[in-house]
Amino acid sequence: MGRCYISQKSTLFGNKRSHSMNAIKRIWKTNLQSIRIEDENGKIKKIKISARSLKKLNFKRV
């Protein structure tokens, strides 16, 4: 299961409810993007980050 490197968001589990309130299991997956960034030592690191975090933090890609 994927997890965001910044916000630690992962998959959510729950129920989808119909009009008659019948419960149907479902999964909400995070919108993870795989990017390469450069760390403090100059090494290239590949991380998974959610689209929301990517938009908010404006990472400089390598």
UniProtKB/Swiss-Prot annotation:
Coiled coil: none
GO CC terms, sorted: ribonucleoprotein complex; ribosome
Secretion signal, residue range per the UniProt entry: none
Recorded superkingdom: Bacteria
Molecular function as annotated in GO: structural constituent of ribosome
Keywords for the protein's UniProt record, in alphabetical order: Ribonucleoprotein, Ribosomal protein
HAMAP family assigned to the protein according to its UniProt record, in alphabetical order: Ribosomal_bL28
Cited PANTHER family: 50S RIBOSOMAL PROTEIN L28, LARGE RIBOSOMAL SUBUNIT PROTEIN BL28A
Protein name as catalogued: Large ribosomal subunit protein bL28
Biological source species: Phytoplasma mali (strain AT)
Source lineage: Bacteria, Bacillati, Mycoplasmatota, Mollicutes, Acholeplasmatales
